[in-house]
C-alpha cells in the first residue's frame, strides 16, 4: 500500500513537471525555443534537432544552431514591435504605431511623410503627430526621425547637449561638408574658432541608429502563424519557416551499456526526449487552435479594420477551447500573425465590451475608440460634433454607444470638447 502511494506521488510530480515544461515551451518565442531545443539536443543523446528554415544558414544543410544563436542580432522591426507591445495597451494605438514601424527605413528614419501615414491609418494629422512624439522616445534614441537633423537633435536632447548653437549647427550641417565654417559661425552667432568645439560635441551622435540591427527583407523571426483569406473565409496555418523539428531516437537506447545505473539514466533521458516532443506538438496545436478562434471571431476586423472588432477576451477564447485563460495568454504573448497585407500582433484581436445606449448589443472598446477618433478627425472644424451628435452617428453606423462612453473615449484620445474645438478653430 505504501509502495503504491509512493509510486502515485512520483507519477503526479512527474506529470506536474511535464505540464510546467509544456507551458514554458508554449510561452517561448521562436528564438527562445530554438535556443532551448539546441541545448536539449546537445545534452540528450536521444534527440536530434532540425532548425526551422528561418534559422538555417545559407551555407548548406549543416546548421550550427549554437553559433547562430550566439551571432544573433535582432531585426529593427522586431526590436520596435517589442517596444510597441510594452508601450501601448489599446489596439488602435498599437495598429497606428505599427503603421509607423512599417514606414521605417534601415537607417531608423521614417521613409514616409506624416501626412501619408495618417492617411493610410485613417487618423488625423494631429493624432499622428502625437503618436510620433511617443515613438521618438523609443530606444535607441533617433528612431522615427524624419531626417538627419531630426535624428541628431533627438540624440543631442537625450545627451543634454542641445544648446541653441548645437541645434543651429545641426540644422545647417550641410555647411560643414561644404567647408563654409564662416557662414556657420554667423548663423551660430559665434567666432569661427568655436565651430570645431561645437562639432566635437555632436561627433559621437549616431546619424543612423537603425543600422545597429539586422536588415533582411523579412524580420529575422517571421510570424509564427499565417492567415489566408479564401473564397470561404479565413484559414490559419503554422508558419513552417519558424516551426522546428525534433526527432526522438528510440533506436539509440539499445546501444547503451549494461550498467544498471547508466541504463536508468538513459531511460530518464529517453523519457525527457519523449516529453519534449509531446510538449512541442502541444505548443503547435495550441497556437493553431487559438489563432483559428481569433480569426473566426474577428474576421470583420481583418476584412474592414479596427472599427469592426467585436468584444473578445482571453476568457472567451479559453472557454471555447476548454483551456485556462493563462494558457491563452501565453499563446498570444508577443506573437504575430501574417496576413496577405501585413503582420499583426495576436493581442490586437482582443477587445473589451463598453457601455451601450439602452442596453443594446455589446460593442468592443476598440471599435468605439476607433469610431470616435475617425468621426472627430473627419468633422468640419468650424462646426465640431457634440458628444450627442457622435452618439447619433454611431447609431446610424450600427454602434449603440452611451454618451458617457463617447465623452470618456474622447478624453482618452486627447480630444477636446466640441466647445473647445470650436474655439481652437476660430483662433486659427
Curated annotation (Swiss-Prot):
Specify the species.
Rhodobacter capsulatus (strain ATCC BAA-309 / NBRC 16581 / SB1003)
Task: Spell out the protein name for this chain.
Answer: RNA polymerase sigma-54 factor
Location of motif RPON box in this chain is 402-410
Q: Which UniProt keywords apply?
A: DNA-binding, DNA-directed RNA polymerase, Nitrogen fixation, Nucleotidyltransferase, Sigma factor, Transcription, Transcription regulation, Transferase
The gene designation is rpoN
Gene3D superfamilies documented for this protein? Homeodomain-like, RNA polymerase sigma-54 factor, core-binding domain
The record's similarity note reads:
Belongs to the sigma-54 factor family.
A biological process (GO) of this protein is: DNA-templated transcription initiation
**Could you tell me the superkingdom of the organism this chain comes from?**
Bacteria
Amino acid at each position: 500500500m505504501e509502495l503504491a502511494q509512493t509510486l502515485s506521488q512520483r507519477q503526479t510530480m512527474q506529470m506536474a513537471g511535464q505540464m510546467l515544461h509544456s507551458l514554458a515551451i508554449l510561452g517561448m518565442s521562436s528564438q527562445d525555443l530554438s535556443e532551448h531545443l539546441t541545448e536539449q539536443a546537445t545534452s540528450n543523446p536521444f534527440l536530434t534537432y532540425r532548425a526551422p528554415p528561418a534559422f538555417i544558414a545559407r551555407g548548406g544543410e549543416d546548421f550550427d544552431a549554437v553559433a547562430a544563436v550566439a551571432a544573433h542580432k535582432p531585426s529593427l522591426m522586431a526590436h520596435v514591435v517589442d517596444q510597441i507591445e510594452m508601450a501601448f495597451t489599446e489596439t488602435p494605438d498599437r495598429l497606428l504605431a505599427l503603421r509607423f514601424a512599417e514606414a521605417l527605413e534601415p537607417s531608423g528614419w521614417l521613409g514616409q511623410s506624416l501626412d501619408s501615414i495618417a492617411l493610410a491609418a485613417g487618423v488625423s494629422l494631429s493624432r499622428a503627430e502625437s503618436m510620433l512624439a511617443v515613438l521618438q522616445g523609443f530606444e535607441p534614441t533617433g528612431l522615427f526621425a524624419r531626417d538627419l537633423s531630426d535624428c541628431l537633435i533627438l540624440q543631442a536632447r537625450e545627451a543634454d547637449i542641445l544648446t541653441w548653437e548645437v541645434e543651429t549647427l545641426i540644422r545647417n550641417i550641410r555647411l560643414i561638408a561644404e567647408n563654409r565654417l564662416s557662414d556657420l559661425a554667423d548663423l551660430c552667432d559665434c567666432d569661427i574658432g568655436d565651430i570645431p568645439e561645437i562639432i566635437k560635441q555632436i561627433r559621437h551622435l549616431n546619424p543612423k541608429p537603425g543600422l545597429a540591427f539586422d536588415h533582411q527583407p523579412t524580420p529575422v523571426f517571421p510570424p509564427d502563424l499565417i492567415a489566408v483569406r479564401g473564397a470561404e473565409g479565413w484559414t490559419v496555418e503554422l508558419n513552417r519557416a519558424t516551426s522546428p523539428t525534433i526527432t526522438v531516437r528510440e533506436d539509440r537506447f539499445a546501444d547503451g551499456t549494461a550498467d544498471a545505473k547508466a541504463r536508468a539514466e538513459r531511460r530518464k533521458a529517453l523519457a525527457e526526449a519523449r516529453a519534449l516532443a509531446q510538449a512541442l506538438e502541444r505548443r503547435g496545436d495550441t497556437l493553431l487552435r487559438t489563432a483559428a478562434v481569433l480569426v473566426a471571431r474577428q474576421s470583420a476586423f481583418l476584412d474592414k479594420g479596427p472599427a469592426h472588432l467585436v468584444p473578445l477576451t482571453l476568457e472567451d477564447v479559453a472557454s471555447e477551447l476548454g483551456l485556462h485563460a493563462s494558457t491563452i495568454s501565453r499563446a498570444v504573448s508577443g506573437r504575430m500573425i501574417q496576413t496577405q497585407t501585413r503582420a499583426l500582433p495576436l493581442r490586437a484581436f482582443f477587445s473589451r465590451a463598453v457601455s451601450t445606449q439602452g442596453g443594446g448589443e455589446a460593442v468592443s472598446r476598440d471599435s468605439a475608440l476607433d469610431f470616435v477618433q475617425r468621426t472627430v478627425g473627419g468633422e468640419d472644424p468650424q462646426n465640431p460634433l457634440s458628444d450627442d451628435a457622435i452618439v447619433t452617428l454611431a447609431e446610424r453606423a450600427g454602434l449603440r454607444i452611451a454618451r458617457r462612453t463617447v465623452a470618456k473615449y474622447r478624453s482618452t484620445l486627447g480630444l477636446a470638447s466640441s466647445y473647445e474645438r470650436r474655439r481652437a478653430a476660430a483662433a486659427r
